[in-house]
């Protein structure tokens, strides 16, 4: 006998990227982590917090982070809400806006967690297909019964493509509901949508420190929205959702913009090399604005290639999409990791 709600029993749940065993020598190029260590300032900040002690609750509003992030992003601190990773932010937004029976809209293919969040609420989800240029048409903004929230990952995963901010603003202004622009990968891109929050109160931008700041193991994210949105989200936020270590570390991370610029520049160079080399092997590679590349092949099935890489110690993400096709999403690693990955791709194609 199950005691869960029927929608929980019926759902599959979100399945994260495969994780190697602790101590394994497998190279992870499947979950879009940063291949380099975080800023040394982060390590010093964590040491300071530990020396101060962990016996007291943290600041429930992560004020130090919000103040510094506001300066970096050019928004007031009270336009920022922090969470235990941006996934918690996405969860809070879904809880706040979407009730049982409501409709949540998302692009396809994109981040599969969005659909899971709708299922948890007992809500419906509607997937709107990207066109061949990874753009969204009028059907994404069309009114629909019960439509309460829409997600737009920008840059998108798995494609790494980005819709320009001017087009995003047009989408938001036509939307009959709030539009969450998920900017998990935006620091690797040429532009961002933060300024749209000031122009349209339906725009909510979510960010994470997992990718560009190399803090995936820490769990810290935030969103930027107009104050009335932030005030509503505070009502449902867990009281102490961000711990003292993550607040201290994330504040130090966002303060070190010189480290961020250097790290992002290095990854962008490696991204270009990975994409060019994959194309030379015969893959079709979408121009990426993220820290990964999306590879398809005109004639070769990709699952055997994925399995060949896995057998030889390289994990990439094999992602088949119904009605769309299959692809390999390959995270940008170090130059040495990329060299091994490319050699294995070439080897697999010869089989």
Please give the residue ranges for each predicted region.
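PLP-dependent enzyme catalytic core of the Aspartate aminotransferase-like
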Residues: 308-312, 317, 321-351
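Conserved PLP-binding catalytic core of the aspartate aminotransferase-like
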Residues: 268, 280-312, 328
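Generic structural signal for small/hydrophobic residues in well-ordered secondary structure
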Residues: 8, 29, 69, 80, ...
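Active-site phosphate-binding strand-loop segment of PLP-dependent enzymes
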Residues: 126, 130-187
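Phosphate-binding glycine-rich loop
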Residues: 63-103, 121, 299
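N-terminal "arm"/small-domain region of PLP-dependent enzymes with the aminotransferase-like
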Residues: 1-56, 146
């Amino acid at each position: 006998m199950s005691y869960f709600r029927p929608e929980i029993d019926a759902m599959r749940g979100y399945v994260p990227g495969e994780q190697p065993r602790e101590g394994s020598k497998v190279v992870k190029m499947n979950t879009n982590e940063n291949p380099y260590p975080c800023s040394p300032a982060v390590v010093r900040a964590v040491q300071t917090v530990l020396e101060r002690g962990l016996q007291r609750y943290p600041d429930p509003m992560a004020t130090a982070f919000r103040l510094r992030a506001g300066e970096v992003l050019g928004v007031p601190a009270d336009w920022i809400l922090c969470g235990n990773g941006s996934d918690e932010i996405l969860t809070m937004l879904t809880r706040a806006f979407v009730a049982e029976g409501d409709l949540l809209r998302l692009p396809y293919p994109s981040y599969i967690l969005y659909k899971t969040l709708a299922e948890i609420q007992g809500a419906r989800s509607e997937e709107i297909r990207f066109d061949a240029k990874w753009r969204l048409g009028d059907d994404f903004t069309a009114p629909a019964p019960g439509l309460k929230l829409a997600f737009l990952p920008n840059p998108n995963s798995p494609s790494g493509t980005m819709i320009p901010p001017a087009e995003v603003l047009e989408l938001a202004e036509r939307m009959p509901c709030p539009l969450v622009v998920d900017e998990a990968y935006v620091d690797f891109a040429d532009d961002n949508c933060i300024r749209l929050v000031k122009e349209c109160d339906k725009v909510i931008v979510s960010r994470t420190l997992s990718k560009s700041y190399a803090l995936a193991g820490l769990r810290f994210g935030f969103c930027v929205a107009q104050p009335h949105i932030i005030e509503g989200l505070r009502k449902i936020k867990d009281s102490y959702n961000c711990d003292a270590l993550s607040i201290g570390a994330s504040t130090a991370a966002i303060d070190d913009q010189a480290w961020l610029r250097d790290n992002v520049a290095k990854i962008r160079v490696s991204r270009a090399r990975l994409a060019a080399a994959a194309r030379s092997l015969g893959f079709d590679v979408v121009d990426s604005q993220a820290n990964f590349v999306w590879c398809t092949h005109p004639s070769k099935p990709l699952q055997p290639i994925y399995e060949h890489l896995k057998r030889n110690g390289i994990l990439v993400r094999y992602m088949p999409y119904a009605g769309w096709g299959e692809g390999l999403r390959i995270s940008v690693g170090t130059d040495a990791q990329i060299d091994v990955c490319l050699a294995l791709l070439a080897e697999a194609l010869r089989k």
